Swiss-Prot record:
PANTHER family: TRANSCRIPTION FACTOR MYB8-RELATED-RELATED (PTHR47999), TRANSCRIPTION REPRESSOR MYB4 (PTHR47999:SF23). InterPro entries: Homeodomain-like_sf (IPR009057), Myb_dom (IPR017930), Myb_TF_plants (IPR015495), SANT/Myb (IPR001005). It comes from Hordeum vulgare. SMART domains: SANT. Keywords: Activator, DNA-binding, Nucleus, Repeat, Transcription, Transcription regulation. It is found in: Nucleus. GO terms for molecular function: DNA binding. Germinating seed and apical meristem of shoot and root. Possible transcription activator in response to an external signal. May be involved in the regulation of flavonoid biosynthesis. The gene is MYB1. The keyword Nucleus applies. This is Myb-related protein Hv1. It comes from the Eukaryota.
Amino acid sequence: MGRSPCCEKAHTNKGAWTKEEDDRLTAYIKAHGEGCWRSLPKAAGLLRCGKSCRLRWINYLRPDLKRGNFSHEEDELIIKLHSLLGNKWSLIAGRLPGRTDNEIKNYWNTHIRRKLTSRGIDPVTHRAINSDHAASNITISFESAQRDDKGAVFRRDAEPAKAAAAAAAISHHVDHHHRSNPQLDWGQGKPLKCPDLNLDLCISPPIHEDPMVDTKPVVKREAGVGVGVVGLCFSCSMGLPRSSDCKCSSFMGLRTAMLDFRSIEMK
């Protein structure tokens, strides 16, 4: 349920207040105080709504109301309060004695907004208008910097392709030079020879080593070349087919010796 109306609208006057109504309302409030605005019109003998009586008293008939223009100090106070409170005109009016919220609101919209704009200040945010433009310029420059970074990335991506193209050109030039001068080669005209290695696999039974006996093979070296392990003939040490004179040990026809290729020591 909503609030009941403060008066009967059928028996109330509307429109501008007359001087007689102002005098009657002023005399009643001076004698009895403000009291309840719902019952005040009937007690004062006025055919007005309680809300209309309240607004007429607060905005026009109060004895402490200030008449005339706003001072420079009041202008600065209104600007400072508006920057803190915003459009809460009733709170701003409470800090300016003798001024009403409706009066301050009208004065703000007609005078103070223009004054702040002429100073280069935004009347809504109370910040310099030039700073807003500077912020937009900073945003634009930041976007351009991002574009530059992307362009730099594209350039860095293109550098490996250029390096590969340069390497291909150098390789083509070297090949062409070798074809035109066949005598100039890395081996000075001599073909490179790979050492002959015996890649045949041999299977040998497991060897049981005595921990008390040194099992290191004895290698015979002649003129810096390893001949083989003692106990192997020359043919077996070089991986050649066995001759009729081979007396190397064997087990069920399987060779039990390991080959020694040039006695290479692996560390």
